[in-house]
Structures are given as C-alpha cells and as structure tokens.
C-alpha cells in the first residue's frame, strides 16, 4: 500500500517536457566532446528536437494536466503549462538568432547550447514548483546558468564585468529568498506553498510581514522591477546579445510564474499587503523604466530599460487579481516574447554586419537594409502599444482588467508611460527611415553587402520573419489567444478559490 501511494503521488509524467530538455543538455555536451565541427553541425539539430519535443508534450498535457507530482513539490497545471510553453518557445527563437553570433565570436556552440538549455530547464521547473526547496533548486539552476551565459565571451571584459555584477546581485537575492523561506518554514512547519498559506492565516506578525518582503524582493529581482533593477542595464549591455534576448523573456516569464504561485498560495491571507507592494513596484518600474530609456544612446541599454517598464505593465494584471487580469498578464508575456525577440533579432543582425550597438549608427538604415528597418519598426511599435499590433491588444486587456478592478492609478500611470515609450521607440524609427542619404551614419554608408547563405544566418532569418509576422498580424487573433490564456487561468485549481474570493469582493 505505501508503494502504491508513493507511485500515485510521484506522477513523473508531469516533467516529461523537462526530461526532453535534459536529454538535449546531455546530447549537446556529447557532440561538443566530438569536436567543434561536429558540434556546429549537430548541436542546433539536437536543440530543435529537444525543444520541439518539449513543446509537443506540453500541448498533450494541456488536456490532461497533472496537479500533484513528486509528493506535492511540483504541479503541471494549466497555468504552469502556459508559462513553460512561453519559456520553451522563447529559448527556441533565442537559439535560432544566436548560432551566427556564437560562430562569429569563436565560442564553442555545443557548450553554449547546453548552458542555454540548462537555464531553460531551471526556468520551466520554477514555473511549476510548489515547494520552497524545489523553488530554490529551480531558481539556482536558472541563475547559475544565466551567470555563465552573461560571461560567455571570455575575451570581452564587458562580458566578464556583466557576469560578475549579475553573480553578486543574484547571490544576494538567493540569500534573501532563503532567509525569507526560513521564516515561512519556522511559522508553518512545512515547505509546501499551499500548506504555508493555510498555517500562517492566523499568524499575522512582524516575522510574516518580513518574510513577505524578502520573498517579494527575490521576485522583483527576477522580473527586473524597480528598485531591484540596477543589474539590468549593465548586464544587458555587457552580455552577448542572444543571451540578453533570452534573459529578457525566459527569465522574466519564470519570475512572473513564481510570483503568481507563491503570492496567491503562501500569502493569500496577506492579499492587501502584497498587492500594495506590487502596486508600488509597478508604478516605479513603468515610470523609471520608460523615462530613463529616453536618454539612452545604446540600443541594448534602451531595450533594458524598456523591459523594466514592460514588467510594470504585466504587474497591472497580477495586482488586479481577477481572472481577466491574470489572463491578460499571460497573454502579454506571450506577445512580449515575439515583440522583444523580434527587436533583438534586428539588433543582432545589425551588430553582426557593423559591430555597433549605438542608436545613432542606425541613422539612414532604410536605404541599405529595409528588412531590419521594417522588422525593428514593427516590433518597437508593438512594444509601444500602437494598433493594430499584438502589443496594443495585450495592453488593452491589461488596462481594462486593471480599470475593472478599480486600479485607476496603475492604469493612468500605464497610459502615460506608454505614451512616453512611444516617443523613444518612434525616435529610433524616425532615425532609420527619415534621414536623407547624406545624413546617414558613417557605418550605414559603408554597410556591407547582405549575404544570407552564411552559416547561422538562415535560422536567424526564419526567427526574424516569424517574430515580424506574429507581431504584425497577431492582433487579428488576439481574442482567441486571450480565450486560451483565460482557460489556462480558469482551469488551474489553486487559482479557482482565490478568484472566487476576489469576485465576491467586487
């Protein structure tokens, strides 16, 4: 009988998608041992098979989720499936745009792919972790791999500096999480997130509030929310651009998945407190992220501050605490995947051809490279929330959900900062399109001939076309996509009780 109970509670099929990622890690490391030529040929194929199999298995799990696996330490519910799918897809696109960059930098491709897949594994496990211990293991798997990726260009001092800064701040965030977790365990006698929520209902104290602040600090670090954002611009500027592309979507998505799960389960009785703190973080992130982005001269730093502001928009949906709000947050993260990675695809392509990251060097680019100009323009307009782009509908759903939940201040700040973001996005577009031939930058004047048959460029082209198409045409499918996100929220058991209480309060 005990063996039967153990078998039932284990439910190992819940992590089949992660198992495919693990096999991909092993495969890429093995081909890396066979030599650089073998790795260059087979590492991408292994990654595609691994991530494709993971996405297919997630699709099969959608209709048959596993809500209690590994003795209650992992849930493969619909919300976790949605977030894990976003992360796996972001990794696939990030790898497509990274092969040429990695090849040109002279870095081992197999090793790079293995570390990216390791970060993906940690991020996906974090989305479904329901135990303080499994959360920490997943968090550290993601973090350590991210540190390695940030410093992957060993010969570039900026990359090493970025990795060191990321390591120091990330280690502090991990220590803060452990300290907060120790308080939660001491108060509840359990490491299970749901059990903690039940045990601390009648134990409001300074220690409980302190644990909330510590855990929320870790969440804010992962999603790069103000004032825990200081690492973001420096790490984004110094790290390899494909790594930045992955971190801006994959790591942020995992952070939001973790935030929703721990705040709505362990701190469900502190609903007002964490929503107040999240509101402050959202306002600061939207305001500072978009205002400081105005003054940036580096494209990567501008996108770094932009990502801080985008995190603030997603937080509007989480603070609303309603089914529509959480659904809008999921939808916007899915839209952000294509908008942001599309923009980074253009930045990578431009840097491969020119070696420059300065915004001023994009001046007059339309005359030499219409594809990058069109792609970057569409993605930036979508990030700004202009119709009929996918980003516009994502923001509309977030603002409507916030307004319906009486989050008027958040919505007003969101609207104002969206207008500010449109200004600096359009400034870049204007620089690329409007300039006369004689006003083009020196780099654009000597722009090299475009050759798409070079190793690594065809996958980048596929990723760029995909992101442009989804960003530009995704608005047409915004309603079906929102319904899909809505079903992910409504069919997740741990959210049903929370949503019922919220609906009764409205």
From Swiss-Prot:
Gene Ontology BP terms: ATP synthesis coupled electron transport; photosynthesis, light reaction
Top class in the EC scheme: translocase
Membrane topology reported for the UniProt record: Multi-pass membrane protein
Localization (cell): Cellular thylakoid membrane
UniProt key word Glycoprotein: no
HAMAP family (alphabetical): NDH1_NuoN_1
Described function: NDH-1 shuttles electrons from an unknown electron donor, via FMN and iron-sulfur (Fe-S) centers, to quinones in the respiratory and/or the photosynthetic chain. The immediate electron acceptor for the enzyme in this species is believed to be plastoquinone. Couples the redox reaction to proton translocation, and thus conserves the redox energy in a proton gradient. Cyanobacterial NDH-1 also plays a role in inorganic carbon-concentration.
Protein name as annotated: NAD(P)H-quinone oxidoreductase subunit 2
Species of provenance: Prochlorococcus marinus (strain MIT 9515)
Lineage: Bacteria, Bacillati, Cyanobacteriota, Cyanophyceae, Synechococcales
